[in-house]
Design a protein with these regions (language model features):
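Repeat-blade elements of multi-bladed beta-propeller folds
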Residues: 295, 300, 343-345
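Generic detector of contiguous secondary-structure segments
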Residues: 49-61, 66, 123, 276-293, ...
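Extended, well-ordered alpha-helical scaffold segments
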Residues: 18-20, 174-179
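Juxtacatalytic substrate-recognition/specificity segment
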Residues: 1-91, 106
Length: 363
């Protein structure tokens, strides 16, 4: 996990690190106190699960972050920690490599060292594929700092495309190690990773990134050509002025129910009729599962995750539904963590997660 980062866990301060397991929260992980403690939130995602056990994915990904943060406690960077403490380490991690490159490097690690990893999922770089195919080639900064008009994937995807592309195209698996050691030796070089890019690729950072984009588009285009012919399609909704995303589509008779959201809009449930006219149904949760319609009653069910009002490290899941022709939401009360309901007449089947890691089907 640590080899190509140039550091190992504990190299900066020579101490062991506690790992705290949280089994009451949504899937996530963090390296706190920069880096003095690892927190693993072990309940796997019910809406975007990985084929590998979530605890394994977390262990590999967060362990890489531990090694990444060691450089701020070594060489010429170390004296600054005497004055600024742990704040300095997190600051230099954001200034020198940046959050995108750090997360992209960690995704490369989880992909390389496990049979799964986000780098192997089909939708992780899919937006770039579609964007390039429509002539949408942007500079790195425009992909990173999006606007209300132009969308972009999160910094995990951008970092993976960048770091993975450099490794693939220029054969430099030691890229992060070179950058970290340069930043540790010469704190005054705030562009240490730009310097490393020029050294290992012979090009400026943005030019090297654009070459990665061109190369990936060539590979993706060849793959797309081999998959022809495609099913023809046409737009159902009109083009919005600002970026808008329609997801979780559900066909109900002549209507389509969809979750609409964008950079300037919170998620809402909308109904699109056969004429393409959009009707607002209700506000919607940010973290929710797919829509499921019960044919006889016309009810639409889903599950959503919410944070406990008192304990913000504890999350709850509840099953909700709306009646046909209504926007009022109802809740199926249950103290368990229930996800992804499926309905048949008066019965509801749902997946139940246990704190210990087991899962069941509840009826």
């Amino acid at each position: 996990v640590s080899l190509t980062s140039g550091y190992v866990s504990g190299e900066g301060d020579g101490k062991k690190m506690p790992v705290v397991m949280h089994s009451y929260n949504a899937a996530n992980g963090s390296v706190a106190w920069a880096p003095k403690r690892m927190d693993l939130f072990t309940i796997p995602s019910a809406y975007d699960p990985e084929p590998l056990p979530w605890s394994t994915m977390l262990s590999v990904h967060e362990s890489r972050h531990i090694t990444q943060m060691q450089f701020g406690m070594t060489k010429a960077q170390k004296p600054f920690t005497w004055a600024f403490g742990q704040m300095w380490n997190i600051l230099v991690s954001l200034v020198y490599p940046g959050i995108s490159n750090m997360e992209g490097d960690a995704v490369i690690t989880e992909t390389a060292w496990t049979p799964s990893g986000r780098g192997r999922t089909a939708d992780f770089l899919n937006y770039y594929w579609v964007a390039f195919d429509n002539g949408d080639f942007r500079s790195w900064d425009k992909w990173r700092f999006v606007s209300q008009v132009n969308n972009a994937p999160d910094y995990y995807s951008l970092g993976y495309l960048t770091m993975g592309g450099f490794r693939y195209l220029y054969d430099c698996p030691e890229f992060m190690s070179e950058g970290y050691h340069l930043a540790a030796r010469r704190p005054y070089n705030l562009g240490a990773f730009y310097t490393t890019t020029r050294k290992l690729t012979g090009k400026k950072f943005n030019k090297a990134f654009m070459e990665v984009c061109d190369t990936m588009y060539t590979l993706w285009k060849a793959d797309a050509e081999a998959r022809k012919p495609y099913i023809p399609s046409e737009p159902v909704t009109s083009k919005s002025r600002f970026y808008t995303d329609y997801s979780n589509n559900l066909i109900a008779g002549n209507d389509i129910y969809s979750i609409k959201k964008g950079h300037s809009d919170a998620p809402i449930l909308v109904r699109i009729d056969s004429a393409g006219k959009e009707h607002r149904v209700s506000r919607f949760a940010y973290d929710a599962g797919r829509l499921q319609r019960e044919p006889e009653s016309g009810r639409i069910y889903w599950s959503e995750t919410s944070t406990d009002k008192r304990w913000n490290l504890q999350t709850k899941s509840r099953i909700r539904y709306i009646e046909k022709g209504s926007g009022r939401k109802h809740t199926v009360d249950n103290p368990q963590l229930l996800y992804n309901p499926s309905t048949c007449r008066s019965y509801i089947a749902a997946v139940r997660y246990e704190m210990g890691g087991k899962s069941y089907i509840d009826l």
